[in-house]
Amino acid sequence: MVDQSPRRVVVAALLLFVVLCDLSNSAGAANSVSAFVQNAILSNKIVIFSKSYCPYCLRSKRIFSQLKEEPFVVELDQREDGDQIQYELLEFVGRRTVPQVFVNGKHIGGSDDLGAALESGQLQKLLAAS
C-alpha cells in the first residue's frame, strides 16, 4: 500500500508545479529567441550571426566592410542565449554553424556562400535592391 499522507501529496503537487513552470519558462524563452532571430533578419538590411573569434565570421565581416556596408552582427559567443540562437538557426535554415548571413531577409549562407555570391555579382544585386 502506498503512503499518501497529505504532506507527500503537497510535496508531489509542488514538484509538479515547479516542473510545469520550468517547461513554461523554457517555451517562453524559445519563443523569445525565435522572435529575436526573426526580428533581426527582418529589421536589418544585413545580418551576420557570428562568433567573435571565428575566422570565417571575420572574413564575412571583412567582405561587407570592403563593400562599405555595415551589417547588424550578433556575436553568439558574447550572449547568454547564443546556443539557443544557434539551435533556432538550425530550425530556421537547417544550419547551426557560423557565420549565417542574411541580406534583405534572404538567407545567403556561410562564408563560402557569401564569397560565391560576391564573385557571381548576386550579392551586389541583393544589396542594390534595398
From Swiss-Prot:
Keyword Electron transport assigned: yes
Disulphide bond pairs: 54-57
CDD domains according to UniProt: GRX_GRXh_1_2_like (cd03419)
Keyword Glycoprotein: no
Location in the cell: Cytoplasm
UniProt keyword list: Cytoplasm, Disulfide bond, Electron transport, Redox-active center, Transport
Annotated GO CC locations: Golgi apparatus; Golgi cis cisterna
Entries under Gene3D superfamilies matching the protein: Glutaredoxin
Family: Belongs to the glutaredoxin family. CPYC subfamily.
Name of this chain's protein: Glutaredoxin-C3
Taxonomic source organism: Arabidopsis thaliana
